[in-house]
A protein has these predicted regions:
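Short, surface-exposed loop/turn segments at secondary-structure junctions
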Residues: 37-42, 66-70
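Short, solvent-exposed segments of well-ordered alpha helices
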Residues: 38-45, 77, 81
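Amphipathic protein-protein interaction modules
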Residues: 49-106
């Protein structure tokens, strides 16, 4: 399994976003941490990817496989927010996570069987957010 939500850390990020009192500011912070990092840590990468996935779900109605039962209802309820100003940062953060300076990418690269699928999944999200 190589999806955004195939990791416990991703669910921690989702729980934090769902509990956020200022989701736009929190997402921007998660993206900025990744974009500005010399080396992107595992947790930071997940927080940025989950933020990007939520934006993708809200703006593009993209359906992610997610074990959180109310994910789709919750993302629908976020349509009142304008996430479009964050799209470029999300795209940049995904690019950074796929770069050589990313712990998450390094770990996935060790999985010869699923690395390409994981990478393509993130590139597809990035492409949708560029539109």
């Amino acid at each position: 399994n190589y999806g955004v939500f195939d990791d416990d850390t991703a669910y921690d990020a989702l729980i934090d976003l769902k509990g956020s009192s200022d989701i736009i500011a929190d997402m921007e912070q998660y993206f900025d941490e990744v974009i500005q990092a010399e080396y992107i840590g595992y947790d930071e990468a997940h927080y940025a990817l989950v933020s990007a996935a939520v934006i993708d779900s809200v703006i593009n109605s993209f359906v992610y496989r997610c074990d959180e039962e109310d994910y789709f209802e919750w993302t629908s309820s976020q349509k009142c927010f304008d996430f479009s100003p964050l799209k470029q940062k999300a795209v940049t953060a995904i690019g950074a996570i796929l770069s050589d300076n990313s712990e998450l990418r390094e770990l996935w690269e060790e999985n010869e069987e699923l690395y390409e699928a994981w990478k393509e999944d993130k590139l597809s999200m990035q492409k949708r957010l560029q539109q």
